[in-house]
Amino acid sequence: MELAVQTQGLGKRYGRAWALQDCALEVPAGRIAALVGPNGAGKTTLLHLAVGLLRPDAGEVRVFGRDPRAGTSVLADIGFVAQDTPVYRDFTAAELITMGGKLNRRRWDAALARERLAALGIPPDKPAGKLSGGQRAQVALALALAKRPRLLLLDEPIASLDPLARREFMQALMGAVAESETTVLLSSHLLADLERSCDYLVVLQQSRVQLTGPVDELLETHRTLVGPRAGSEAVAGVAKVVRASHTERQSTLLVQRGDGPIDPLWTEHEVTLEDLVLAHLAEADARVTAEAWGVPA
């Protein structure tokens, strides 16, 4: 299995605080991977390390087996759209495409960028600063795709867009990826958009990877159980209780399934991606808080 992104013991520190710590991660080539976590979890730091904008303070990161800081030949395989989809606001879309060609002489598909923006109705002669937020995001995506990258890194590119612009951006992204078989690592808070488009999941919390794997496998191995008020006793067929809530008469558990059937006293329900992510984030928060106080989680 070819790996698009691989990290081992990866860490980045700002002063005494670790923005990312002991990060062990593998993203297989050909996947559309969602990178999820709260503000401050380390998502942007991870992406900046993967694109070579930062130097690790610990461990290593590899993109298709190579150090992203090793030279321009590695960077030629990486497309990157940063937060707020920055583009030169005084340049027109046509001028940005021309500039991109001069900066990426090894491989640049200007025709692809022009065709994509024309199909979206974005004028070639209007300064980027006068385009809408959604249009600027589409320009940034078109420029990244014009590199014909093997890996596309997107750092919350749709966070500030309205629902229609978000949908148009994600549709454009999915169409482009289907044509090119590009691997995507997409950071976002918008779980509903990710559930419709991503087939691989990476959850970051407290500067560490908390959960990773193919979305379909993770959803298959997790369930919500509703049943009689539970104490500390184990539930048959459950490997791990990720999150629990209780009323006087019943308990609701989000669990990782184990071997064998679930105890028939419990009603079993499928989980959504949002259920899964929020439960693991809450578990990580509770564990770190308990460790800080020196009490059992």
Where are the regions that the model predicts?
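The feature captures the beta-strand-to-loop junction immediately N-terminal to the Walker
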Residues: 36-38
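Helix-to-loop junction immediately C-terminal to a conserved catalytic motif
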Residues: 51
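ABC-family P-loop ATPase nucleotide-binding domains
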Residues: 83-139
